[in-house]
């Protein structure tokens, strides 16, 4: 019997991105992104731990109009998007239009060096605004050690307004790779 396909956040590409996220953060800030994720973990274990972490972690590629290439479970829940809708989304769309220029300037600064203490306003899939505070931004190295995108991580955020009428309900449970959510434990199995 063939092995089932892993969920998209445990694909070979996502595992490689998770490794780059963790290595890039350590290089930029001199400390691990997540407590307990150390060199003794396999890349698969580190990718699983990064995906289920309470800290919001996301990254985009280095294109002229960058697109998200990774979002952990906390990011998917906050932006109320399943993996397939979040990954591939132009990253500028995670911020409201009035914040996009300010965001672009901060990203340019982070491209040259790491940036901590970033704050800004973001918008979820239904248009509901929230503030992030004390985010860390850093260059995401490509396979050759050159900048190949950027990453962000933050734990401090809060809603700026009540849910909008007609907004999609918040995701709860475990994000489903096909879309929507399914209830489940906080630790994901190796295969969906």
List each language-model region with its residue ranges.
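PAS-family sensory modules
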Residues: 1-64, 107, 136-171, 187-192
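Sensory/regulatory domains in signal-transduction proteins
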Residues: 51-164
